[in-house]
Structures are given as structure tokens and as C-alpha cells.
């Protein structure tokens, strides 16, 4: 009886180690490109927006943001985004008249993806945006001259240039975790 229990315990420990290793923060190839993590669709969703427009005539989109599980847990516990945090943005066009629905919109074709990574490449506390195509294995850093950086710097508030107003469930979870004890 002891051996089967030992084997089960060892198996569970190994499975836990593999799960933790799957989300060990960002990694980069020899050219400095971000290696796109697998199974991002399993990451906790922290926000979704509809018809949010950044650039004027980009068309209506449904945007979904997911966060790597290790950083999510750390952020909820401490109220801070640890170095290595990855936020995955998926941008899709809305689809209409999808049977059997009689109205409304659902997610349609993907039109863009990017990862916002707290990698501190430009100094302490900084994040880098990495763009990538569907099915890509690596993502290229988006130049810091692009508007996404200045917009996040100017409008995201004091939370690591992350738009917490778009992620109410994450914001609420952080507030509960870091609430002063009375």
C-alpha cells in the first residue's frame, strides 16, 4: 500500500512542477525576440472590451486580455505586478447573426495579438509591447516611439502603466488582498 501512495504523491509533485515550469515568466531567443508562451488561452482572463478605439478608424473590435497565472496570483496577493508579468491582448472583429442567436455579437476573426511584458528592458519598472502574428513562435518588440507607450504612460495611472480601469475583476481582487486589516 505504501508504494502506490508514494508513486501517486511523486506523480502529483511532478505534475505541479511541470505546471509551474509552464509559466516561469518570459523567455527570449538569441535575437532578443520574445518566445510566445504556449496555452495562453488557459491564462486567467482579466478583462474584455467591446468597441474600444485607440486609433480612430480601426473598426469595432472585441478585445480580450489574459494574464499569466503566476503573475496573476502574485498581483492579487501583493497588489503589484512582478517583473516577468505578461498580459496577452487578443483583438477580434465582432461576428453577427451567428445561429441560433437572434441578435448580439460574438467574437469573429482575430486581427491582432500582442503581449505587454514587464521586462524592465528600458529601466526599472518598465514594460515592453511585443507584437506577433497568429501561430507565431516569437514576437518582436514594438518600438518605443509607437503611441502605445506614451498613451499607457499618460493615461494608465499609477499601476505600472496598466489600464486597471479595463480590468475590474483584477482590480477588485487586488483591493481585497491588500486591504488594510482593521
Residue ranges, per PLM feature:
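Sequence context surrounding c-type heme c attachment/ligation sites in exported
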Residues: 25-59, 78-182
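Bacterial N-terminal signal peptides that target proteins for export
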Residues: 1-12
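C-terminal segment of classical bacterial N-terminal signal peptides
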Residues: 14-22
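Short, structured beta-strand/loop micro-motifs enriched in basic residues and often containing a Trp
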Residues: 61-72
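Small/flexible residues
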Residues: 4-5, 68, 115
